[in-house]
């Protein structure tokens, strides 16, 4: 299955608690940290919820 690389580019400070929890659930910590996840509907939904904080590219 395809994979995507998710990079945290903006800080979740001052964002809604749901968005901050989504950042943590994806495994992102500090700015510019990246994770590689499977490209499925659940991950895409999480990324869509915080699309203004992250960049996504094919891994």
Swiss-Prot record:
One of its GO terms (biological process) is translation. The keyword Lyase does not apply. InterPro entries: Ribo_uL30_ferredoxin-like_sf (IPR036919), Ribosomal_uL30_bac-type (IPR005996), Ribosomal_uL30_CS (IPR018038), Ribosomal_uL30_ferredoxin-like (IPR016082). Keywords: Ribonucleoprotein, Ribosomal protein. One of its GO terms (molecular function) is structural constituent of ribosome. One of its GO terms (cellular component) is cytosolic large ribosomal subunit. NCBIfam families: rpmD_bact (TIGR01308). Part of the 50S ribosomal subunit. This is Large ribosomal subunit protein uL30. The gene is rpmD.
């Amino acid at each position: 299955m395809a994979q995507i690389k998710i990079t945290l580019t903006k800080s979740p400070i001052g964002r809604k608690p749901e968005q901050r929890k989504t950042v943590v659930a994806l495994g992102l910590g500090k700015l510019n940290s990246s994770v590689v996840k499977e490209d499925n509907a659940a991950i895409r939904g999480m990324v869509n919820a915080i699309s203004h904080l992250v960049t996504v590219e094919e891994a």
